[in-house]
């Protein structure tokens, strides 16, 4: 009996010892899991922060509206050309010296020169990268233009008897049409030029005068970055750079779009709060304060707004 009791006691002790060992192992295992889970969470957090920083790097900020591929963003796939070209008048550009303020990548500038036959057109933009894009597009257009010239020359020079083509194809054309034809065959690189420039702060008023000046979707960015004073400076410089009777074509952004872009920089956020001159007063300012004589709403005659460019376009005459 005594032995049996001793054996039972020893067995219970061993069971308790085993249970204690198991519980200790369990605690240790749990303790080991905690830092592992914490490490995993930390690693996940670090990866999340890394991804966020990558996203921030990828999300470029354009405080001057100098968006990359701006025209691709604004023009829909089913549009063959910039719809604003349809409201511009040929007589404002044909054989004229023109200036495009805030030209971005130069697509609109080049198309105006090609379609309307400018004598010269200069595109200026504050962003070096956009001007580089503009030069690239110009070289591309010139190559395309030059690739068609040999066949045109051949067809116009073959056959003195007119079987293959007349030697004087412009005889039956009006003077305006003949001028347009000569402008189209002229190398675009001799007509179009681009340069980096902060128009508000650096434009020298002793420079050449222009017959037509464009400022398309630019006023908001001047306004947000330089306030009311910067906007008045822009309008005043444009007026002084225009020839008498010259045309200023403006596409102002509505006030609502100011609100959407006010936080692109500390400067724009600060200026947004102090702006007094709203876009609905621009006509009054340009006519009564700056000195333009007349204004024409170019978009009022359109039956419907084109997708991407549904803003008002105004033409002021000096």
Swiss-Prot record:
Keywords: Methyltransferase, S-adenosyl-L-methionine, Transferase. InterPro entries: Bin3-like, Bin3_C, BIN3_SAM-bd_dom, SAM-dependent_MTases_sf. Residues 37-52 have a biased composition (Low complexity). Its EC number is 2.1.1.-. Residues 1-61, 146-184 are annotated as: Disordered. Residues 82-318 form the Bin3-type SAM domain. One of its GO terms (molecular function) is methyltransferase activity. Residues 16-34 have a biased composition (Basic and acidic residues). It is an enzyme of class 2 (transferase). It holds the Pfam family PrmA. GO terms for biological process: methylation. Probable RNA methyltransferase. Belongs to the methyltransferase superfamily. This is Probable RNA methyltransferase At5g51130. It comes from Arabidopsis thaliana.
